[in-house]
């Protein structure tokens, strides 16, 4: 913790503010990033306040509005104006993973993954506007599963709420970009604890909240998912790595996704940036080995890497042994 705090405090001074733009400070940095990301989603997905938009395919690598997105789920996006209450219903979908992730403008959040109707108010959520992301599991390689995932998306119902428009300060995007780069570099070097970074106000640690709010924006709270975001020692894009996992204690699923030096998925000839325990080919003993780099020889479950790459392990709906630290994900090691 002492090292992390020192590095944050010694980060480069933010760039000079643009005329008429709202200055970025350590106190408002996460708020500014959240407002920026909400605007980015509005533009990227053509959102209108109060209107849900379904993405029918996994994220387009040419249009990644947020760093470290996943390709295990398809997204449905919604921006709420909570000047009036909203009701959201999650459908019964035969056990398929689907979650509703509510993020206020301060990046405090909560998640629900149980079918039912939820009433949201400005008082409960904490800010007038909120971003809501629905994640629905999909296996893109299975046409029947794709159809079922789309039906699950269509079952989400939203009613009530104000009509906007979305309002936020005109934050200095130049300063924000400098701060984002510094904290992304920090997270890649020494990581942060997602269990202490994401949650309601009062549930998070201020340092991990600051780093996670930039390097892992829109990450799920611990009971929804645990994120292991890090970089290996030799992430030169040439040294291959691998990890083997078996009997991972989650109630939903787990995955490994690879990102470039800027935190985005990099297009590659294999068209592969991720594997999860459904899409990966298992070993004879039921374990799963995922390779990172060295894909030219056709090794199984291989994800290409680039210089400066990092990874995110996602553990969806982790069980007690993950949350209390008695079980840890296996180490990612170099491959000879």
Please state what every model-predicted region is.
Residues 20-336:
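A compositional/structural signature for long, glycine/proline-rich flexible linkers
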């Amino acid at each position: 913790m002492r090292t992390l705090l020192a590095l944050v405090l010694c980060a480069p001074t933010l760039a000079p503010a643009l005329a008429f733009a709202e200055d970025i400070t350590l106190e408002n940095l996460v708020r500014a990033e959240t407002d920026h990301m909400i605007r980015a989603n509005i533009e990227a997905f053509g959102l209108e306040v109060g209107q849900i938009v379904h993405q029918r395919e996994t994220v387009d690598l040419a249009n990644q509005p947020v760093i470290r997105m996943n390709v295990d789920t398809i997204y449905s996006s919604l921006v709420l104006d909570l000047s009036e209450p909203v009701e959201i219903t999650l459908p019964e979908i035969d056990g398929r993973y689907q979650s509703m992730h509510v993020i206020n403008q301060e990046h405090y959040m909560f998640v629900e993954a149980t079918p039912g109707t939820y009433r949201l108010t400005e008082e409960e959520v904490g800010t007038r506007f909120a971003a809501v992301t629905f994640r629905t599991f999909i296996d893109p390689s299975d046409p029947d599963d794709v159809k079922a995932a789309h039906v699950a998306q269509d079952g989400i119902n939203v009613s009530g709420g104000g009509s906007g428009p979305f309002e936020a300060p005109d934050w200095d995007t130049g300063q924000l970009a400098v701060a984002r780069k510094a904290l992304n570099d920090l997270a890649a070097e020494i990581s942060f604890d997602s269990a202490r970074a994401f949650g309601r106000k009062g549930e998070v640690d201020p340092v991990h909240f600051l780093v996670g709010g930039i390097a892992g924006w829109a990450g799920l709270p611990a009971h929804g998912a645990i994120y292991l975001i890090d970089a290996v020692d030799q992430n030169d894009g040439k040294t291959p790595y691998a990890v083997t996992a078996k009997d991972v204690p989650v109630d939903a699923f787990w995955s490994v996704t690879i990102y470039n030096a800027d935190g985005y998925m990099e297009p590659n000839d294999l068209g592969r940036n991720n594997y999860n325990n459904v899409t990966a080919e298992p070993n004879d003993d039921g374990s799963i080995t995922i390779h990172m780099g060295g894909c030219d020889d056709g090794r199984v479950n291989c994800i290409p890497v680039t210089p400066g790459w990092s990874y995110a392990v996602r553990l969806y709906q982790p069980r007690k042994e993950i949350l209390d630290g008695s079980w840890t994900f296996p180490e990612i090691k170099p491959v000879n």
